[in-house]
Amino acid sequence: MTGEGPDSADPLSEALAGLRIVDLTRLLPGPLATLRLAQWGADVLKVEDPGEGDGARTLWRTEAEAEAGEPGAFYRRLNAGKRVLRLDLRSDAGKATLLDELRGADALVEGFRPGVMARLGLGFEAVSAHNPKLVMVSISGYGQHGPWAQRAGHDINYIAMAGLLEQVASGGGEIALPNFQVGDLLGGSQAALSALLAALLAARRTGRGCHLDISMAHEVLRHQVVVRTALEALGRVPPAGCDLLSGGAPCYGVYRTADGRHLAVGALELKFWQGVCATLGRPQWERRHWSLGEAPGSEPAMALRAELQAVLATQPLAHWVQVFDTVDACVTPVLRLDEALRHPLFAG
């Protein structure tokens, strides 16, 4: 799939044709999940309140768009291919219209704070009474139940609580907030999407829908496979920047070049590391690999990392890109987004 709306070149563009989705979500997690459904051929009806509507409308909006009262690119990107209906769900008329839509729908996706749908008279029991096959997906920060259910939060809070943010730090301990919303996108969008598709298959087989409780914080924690395994094996959480995949192994890390840019070395397997060593003329490094006993984060490993950094700091990024271009060693430049969009890998 290459486009951001339904794509005729995508073999999945009609995979969900005939599926009807009602989307009450706003901002990023829910709208991205339902965007994927629309891209795969589902009929997605986005319901917004008659006032300001989805807050995403005003994010990253140009002055011209604001003056014209038009939504910005962020909203348009997340809601391409969807129909939009303005409803006041606090009014009897608005609720009646929504329930009419739900009678013929396959799924309802919502992202209100837990309890809001029930207070509106639109909880799972109420909507399933009108459509027993309906799958309802509720996306929230901390789940529909439990002591944290009513707490507000955003992506930064979900990844902080799930132990992910603590790992996104340099050796000096400074945390770098990623400009990729892991909690929203993995814990919210992708988790909701995969669970919804499974629930739709079950509903078609059994004739009964279900209510899916998607907690973004819990989903991020559930996906902490690498660090959690390290914790179980070592009895402790590896310090940030010192684990096998976070910078503790010289063969797998990010290195600064002479021009202040960075090179990503992903030579995780021994054969790739040997390719790096041969290319740099450092055969003495070949046996210094985690698979041969040099523990990630150990003093010898960090010393070798410093040696490799010193070598890569002698030349600008373009030099190393050219050097490693034909070497099978998993070495790539760290690109800015504008560079990535122009790169032949993505531009074609």
Cite the ranges covered by each PLM segment.
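Aromatic-enriched alpha-helical interface/lid elements that frame and gate functional surfaces
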Residues: C251-V331
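Short Pro/Gly-enriched beta-strand edge/turn motifs at strand-loop
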Residues: R57-T62, A233-A240
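Glycine-rich beta-alpha junction loops
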Residues: G51, G141-G143, M216-L221, D259-R261, ...
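Conserved Rossmann-fold dehydrogenase catalytic segment
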Residues: Q144, G173-V182, R204-V220, R236, ...
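A glycine-rich dinucleotide-binding beta-alpha-beta segment and adjacent secondary-structure elements
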Residues: T326-G348
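Oxidoreductase and adenylate-handling cofactor-binding alpha/beta cores
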Residues: A162, G188-G209, V226-L234, G275-Q284
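N-terminal helix-loop segment corresponding to the beta1-alpha1 unit
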Residues: M1-L200, R204-R205
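NAD(P)-dependent dehydrogenases' Rossmann-like dinucleotide-binding region
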Residues: L164, G188-A191, L212-L221, L268
